[in-house]
Amino acid sequence: MAAKQMEEIQKKLRLLSYPRANAPAQSLLFAGMERYALLEWLFFKLLGDKSPFSQQNLQGDAGVRDEETVRIQYLAEIAKFLGITPTVDIEAIQGHGTYEDRMEMLRNIVDLVEASLFSDNQEWSIDEQVAKDIQLIDAIAERQSLIFSEECKLFPADVQIQSIYPLPDVSELETKLSEQAKILSNLQQKVDDLAAKHAYNPDEEYTEVESQLRARLESFLETARAFNTIYTKEIRPWTHMMEVPQLHGFGPAANRLLEAYNMLLKFLGNLKNLRDSHAALSIGSSGTVAGEPSSVTRIVSDCEAALTVLNRDLGILSASIAREQGERL
């Protein structure tokens, strides 16, 4: 079986016009000058005219051991370059493995050479091929109805061929395009007219809301300051200077005052969220000066300062009420 396969390899070598195709099979499969000469011939058939390697580098006295080593090394580099071996494998050039392994490697190389030679077409050019392809496409376009007709049956019956539907006329498409262009032009003119009548202000709605918020916060701040003034002048002397029994009768009023304080604290506690939200919204606003707080931010800061005073006063008032309730018990 192996001998028959080797005969087929040598037959291919004769068809490829290798001058020593009739050499003994052993000399082609095992290390020696006959094998190296065959591999050299096959490799340069694969490399072609634009080879980065030169056959002159392989010339030398075949009987000298150093020259033979250089030749084997050079063939191993070419084999790696061609992808025949993954690395520079000297043993592969000399031949290793079983008889079948050696024959398989040689057969693969011969098949590569055969495929590359018979696939070459010296008369072929890409320009001519492109011209032929264009002619084919033109012929298909001219005979479209015939190609997709039922007589030809080039496609299965369940395949829907979109091209069988009538195509719109080019002049009709141009007319519709012109009409759409006019509509677009009219719309653009209307947009330009509106823009000329009303100046575009991206911060318009934002500015109005900010103004309303500022007014409400200013009103609240005024109320908070007035309340602190009343507390300092009227309530504080009672809670700090009068004895516990003298607070009799102040309890119901104090409870109402405490409820008002708690509601006030709940409102003021949301000022931080209000300030953060305003800071996020005001980023990029044309009315915001870099490095300077806005009017809303300043008012919120003032309200927070008032909250600090209210917290302190509330603690004193709560302690007084708790003390009075303890005396009653």
UniProtKB/Swiss-Prot annotation:
Keywords: Cell cycle, Cell division, Coiled coil, Cytoplasm, Cytoskeleton, Microtubule, Mitosis. GO terms for cellular component: phragmoplast; spindle microtubule. Residues 169-197 form a coiled coil. One of its GO terms (biological process) is cell division. The keyword Repeat does not apply. Signal peptide: none annotated. Part of the augmin complex composed of 8 subunits. The complex acts on microtubules and interacts with gamma-tubulin in spindles and the phragmoplast. This is AUGMIN subunit 7. It comes from Arabidopsis thaliana (Mouse-ear cress).
